[in-house]
């Protein structure tokens, strides 16, 4: 049985709260000032959390905005699942910090760069190298601790 939209939104809010509680230090290791420039990592991290917490595999979506789309210029990444747009780094553009909606105002208006399911086996090396240290810093702040993503 699929989770409800409200359950997906609650999990996204939990994860964003954990990112905020972990503070800026984990992101500084990646030369990122969250949320600016963190959308790709944040989407991948949230995708793995949603898989473990709710059993859903969301798609990572990356698009380029050739023009200004509501403050978004250049590249942005977020998740999509079952018709939902899920974004936990929109505040870098002046949007809400957590967006979970079936009617996105800005998402989907750019040019598709890439789209793929999160947490794919062939991405494991990249994920642990790029997202592993962030996951380790964020995990203690999650209401449902997840010990193993393997």
Task: List each language-model region with its residue ranges.
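A structural boundary/capping signal
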Residues: 1-150
């Amino acid at each position: 049985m699929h989770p409800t939209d409200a359950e997906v939104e609650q999990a996204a809010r939990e994860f964003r709260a954990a990112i905020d509680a972990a503070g800026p230090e984990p992101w500084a290791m990646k030369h990122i000032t969250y949320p600016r420039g963190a959308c790709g990592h944040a989407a991948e991290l949230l995708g793995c959390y949603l898989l473990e917490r709710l059993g859903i595999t969301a798609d990572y979506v990356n698009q380029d905005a050739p023009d200004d789309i509501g403050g978004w210029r250049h590249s942005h990444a977020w998740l999509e699942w079952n018709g939902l747009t899920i974004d936990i780094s929109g505040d870098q553009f002046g949007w809400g910090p957590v967006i979970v909606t079936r009617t996105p105002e800005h998402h989907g208006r750019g040019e598709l760069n890439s789209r793929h399911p999160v947490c794919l086996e062939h991405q494991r090396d990249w994920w642990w190298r790029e997202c592993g240290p962030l996951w380790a810093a964020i995990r203690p702040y999650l209401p449902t601790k997840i010990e193993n993503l393997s």
